[in-house]
Amino acid sequence: DCPSDWSSYDLYCYKVFQQRMNWEDAEKFCRQQHTGSHLLSFHSSEEVDFVVSKTLPILKADFVWIGLTDVWSACRLQWSDGTELKYNAWTAESECIASKTTDNQWWTRSCSRTYPFVCKLEV
């Protein structure tokens, strides 16, 4: 069973938090709520529809943090001519992913920006 103020879908519980935090603080906050709780992860379009039905009425049109970060670190980047990336001019800020509550488009955002968020807990 889900905690009393969490919503249930499939084998998971969800809670929308309106307070705005940066990505790291939001993930830490989720972990403090319950053992096994983290920022939201999506595994099906049906799950997305459920989450949108919960977040949109509360947050209106806004972004929420989801549990993706540093997507580029897993990529082996190279130039279009096939040469290896040895020089780069990336900003020092790490990128995290926020989901738009209106249509579930995922956007890279600076991890230091503050957004509301959704915590997810496996039952």
UniProtKB/Swiss-Prot annotation:
GO terms for cellular component: extracellular region; other organism cell membrane. Pfam families: Lectin_C. It is found in: Secreted. It comes from the Eukaryota. One of its GO terms (molecular function) is toxin activity. Keywords: Disulfide bond, Hemostasis impairing toxin, Platelet aggregation activating toxin, Secreted, Toxin. Expressed by the venom gland. Belongs to the snaclec family. Disulfide bonds join 2-13, 30-119, 96-111. Homodimer (non-covalently linked) of heterodimer of alpha and beta subunits (disulfide-linked). It comes from Trimeresurus purpureomaculatus. Residues 9-120 form the C-type lectin domain. Snaclec that induces platelet aggregation without any cofactor in a dose-dependent manner. Its platelet aggregation effect is blocked by echicetin, suggesting it is a GPIb-binding protein which binds to the same or a closely related GPIb site on platelets as echicetin. This is Snaclec purpureotin subunit beta. Its main location: secreted. PANTHER family: MANNOSE, PHOSPHOLIPASE, LECTIN RECEPTOR RELATED. InterPro entries: C-type_lectin-like, C-type_lectin-like/link_sf, C-type_lectin/snaclec_domain, CTDL_fold.
